[in-house]
């Protein structure tokens, strides 16, 4: 079975893409697909169902999910929701790749996940408000998110064995 490759194009002038996903008017389905970017969904309102590696991951407000590069996944939104999506091209992490030239992340404890979700929501708000100096605020939050991902979420080769 062939799955669709989704090409991720960063927001203009930024090394990532951030946007609000609302699941249409409900009954939204995104069929199985993959991309080379890291993708994080932070649910603000409502709920979503993700399917990844034959596992179901239901998410509700306040929860998040990290989708690694090349992971085949699909999404079902039975109702409208508000979810901030952050897509980070893999090349942003190249200084932290494993010996196999790859990087993977895994969710942590609820406290760390809550902080990461909060940073992603704040990043979206600063970016969309576009107040004076928003570019600095946006990049500052992005680097804080990157730092958290690499420091607390990255799987090393020792973790994977």
Region spans (language model):
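Ligand-binding loop in jelly-roll beta-barrel domains
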Residues: 69-92
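Conserved metal-binding segment of the jelly-roll/cupin
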Residues: 59-72
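Generic protein-terminus/edge-of-domain signal
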Residues: 1-60, 104
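Short, conserved acidic/polar surface loops in the N-terminal third of protein domains
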Residues: 8, 18, 78, 95-99
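Amphipathic alpha-helical segments enriched in hydrophobic/aromatic residues interleaved with Lys/Arg
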Residues: 100-160
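Conserved segment of winged-helix/HTH DNA-binding domains
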Residues: 88-103
């Amino acid at each position: 079975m062939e799955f669709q490759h989704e090409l991720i194009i960063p927001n203009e002038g930024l090394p990532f893409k951030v946007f609000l996903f609302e699941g249409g008017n409900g009954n939204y389905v995104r069929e199985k697909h993959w991309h080379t970017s890291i993708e994080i969904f932070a649910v603000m309102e409502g709920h979503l169902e993700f399917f990844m590696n034959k596992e179901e991951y239901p998410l509700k407000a306040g929860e998040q999910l990290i989708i690694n590069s090349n992971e085949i996944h699909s999404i079902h939104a039975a109702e409208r929701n508000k979810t901030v999506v952050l897509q980070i091209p893999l090349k942003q992490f190249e200084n932290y790749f494993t010996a196999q030239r790859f990087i993977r992340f895994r969710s942590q404890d609820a406290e760390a996940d809550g902080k990461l979700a909060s940073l992603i929501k704040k990043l979206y708000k600063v970016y969309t408000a576009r107040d004076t100096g928003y570019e600095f605020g946006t990049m500052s939050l992005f680097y804080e998110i990157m730092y958290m991902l690499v420091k607390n979420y990255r799987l090393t080769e020792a973790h994977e064995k």
